[in-house]
């Protein structure tokens, strides 16, 4: 049974079509919806704007407002306010998705008199500002997780124990705050 369950789990990662097959180890509905909203807003037109708004409305209740995840270990005083990459991962919202979602919401209501996304935007801003690392940058999930000695642990050969600030996440956070 354990082997059968493991095999079924692996098989569910595979997407097999007539002309191609690929592995999709995770789904990214929040990220995909936010990027699609940006695309629709860029395209313009009433149908595209309505589609973007529908996607953003879907994202509003996915904002993590009441769960302090691992990030709170470094920043216990910061209130939650981010979005996770997946459908439901309240303990691990990430700054990258949060910045992209917030920018799309701000953009969607920017040319209107609507303020319906203001509460979500305020919490996102608060959370992003609260997780800025001491060196001025932002990481994906945490603040000040730069302890490189962790990479010397034998089982950490893939280097996933750290979450240092990166240029791309920092750029998106700065863009969101601008």
Residue ranges and their predicted role:
Residues 1-178:
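Preference for long, amphipathic alpha-helical scaffolds in soluble/luminal domains
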């Amino acid at each position: 049974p354990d082997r059968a369950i493991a095999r079924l789990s692996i098989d569910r990662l595979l997407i097999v079509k007539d002309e191609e097959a690929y592995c999709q180890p995770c789904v990214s509905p929040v990220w995909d919806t936010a990027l699609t909203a940006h695309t629709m807003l860029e395209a313009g037109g009433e149908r595209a704007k309505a589609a973007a708004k529908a996607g953003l409305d879907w994202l509003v209740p996915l904002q993590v407002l009441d769960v302090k995840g691992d990030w709170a270990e470094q920043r216990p005083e910061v209130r939650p306010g981010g979005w996770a990459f997946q459908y439901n991962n309240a303990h691990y919202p990430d700054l990258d998705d949060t910045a992209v979602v917030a920018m799309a919401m701000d953009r969607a209501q920017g040319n209107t008199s609507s303020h319906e996304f203001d509460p979500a935007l305020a919490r996102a801003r608060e959370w992003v500002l609260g997780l800025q690392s001491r060196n001025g940058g932002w990481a994906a999930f945490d603040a000040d997780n730069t302890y490189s000695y962790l990479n010397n642990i034998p089982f950490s050969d893939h280097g996933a124990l750290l979450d240092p600030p990166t240029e791309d996440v920092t750029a998106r956070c700065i863009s969101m705050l601008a």
